[in-house]
Amino acid sequence: MSETVSAKKFGKVAVMLGGTSAERPVSLNSGNAVLAALTRQGIDAHAFDPATRSLGDLMSGEFDRVFIALHGRYGEDGCMQGALELLGIPYTGSGVMASAVGMDKWRTKLLWRAAGLPTADWAMLDATSDFAATEARLGLPIFVKPAREGSSIGMSKVTEAGTLQAAYEKAAEHDALVLAEKFIDGAEFTVGIVGDSALPLIRLQPAAEKAFYDFEAKYLRDDTQYHCPAGLPDAQEMSLRKLALDAFRLLGGRGWGRVDLMTDRLGNPYLLEVNTSPGMTDHSLVPMAARVAGIDFDALCVTILEQTLG
């Protein structure tokens, strides 16, 4: 903990976890890990699950600030951030606008493309789409994903002609907005952001039989490989870190977050998506990169919370 910041200065902290989104189980793991870390540091932290408690309890319970460990809808998409703004309670992470835009992969890509930042070509799908024409335009393989879900929920990799519609229907079970994205053949990276700095890159390498870095690879398997340092030349590492920071700031991101990207076989980068409330589980990526940067998990949680002191 910062020498100038004592545990008492944080007052009473609500660690918001769980919620009602499809990512509730991951959020419970994240929140409980954060709660344990803050408690170890002597901070008066308490679990707060908005699925079972009223937000009015934040006021009646005299909470001074909130550590948001929610993932997905109603926790990561600006809704909770807006409620906390109205209540006048400081909270961790991005504000209303950046949270809402960051949760929407389509609008995120629109902003990046308009600003000249590199992102893979895409098409939006609905039940009336010409799926054959989309396959022809983007080429196979194609990634299909709900535009407003995280943790790779509802995501598919289309590798055979004529199967795009089935992938769309799977994604549409989770969101009315469905994104079809051109496959980038290369390496996948993630960049954690804390404050004004980008953490060391992590290169993701799912097990050989996995088609992509899906929910199972993220949270359930132990054979997914994470390379940090990523093994890139220093100049390329710093260039990708800067790109991630630029992409995060363009959306109005603040506090902390994570940006996912890929490089093709020639080393050209392509932004994939931004996460304004990343996971904090034992499989999570921001804590992993922070450790490489010399920041242990407890210190990371306190650093994120310190940003609510203003």
Swiss-Prot record:
It is found in: Cytoplasm. It catalyses: 2 D-alanine + ATP = D-alanyl-D-alanine + ADP + phosphate + H(+). Pathway: Cell wall biogenesis; peptidoglycan biosynthesis. It comes from the Bacteria. ATP binds at residues 135-190. One of its GO terms (molecular function) is metal ion binding. Keywords: ATP-binding, Cell shape, Cell wall biogenesis/degradation, Cytoplasm, Ligase, Magnesium, Manganese, Metal-binding, Nucleotide-binding, Peptidoglycan synthesis. Mg(2+) 2 binds at residues 273, 275. Its cofactor is Mg(2+); Mn(2+). One of its GO terms (biological process) is peptidoglycan biosynthetic process. Residues 109-306 form the ATP-grasp domain. Binds 2 magnesium or manganese ions per subunit. Disulfide bonds: none annotated. GO terms for cellular component: cytosol. Mg(2+) 1 binds at residues 260, 273. Its EC number is 6.3.2.4. NCBIfam families: D_ala_D_alaTIGR, PRK01372.1. Belongs to the D-alanine--D-alanine ligase family. Cell wall formation. PANTHER family: D-ALANINE--D-ALANINE LIGASE, D-ALANINE--D-ALANINE LIGASE B. This is D-alanine--D-alanine ligase. It comes from Thiobacillus denitrificans (strain ATCC 25259 / T1).
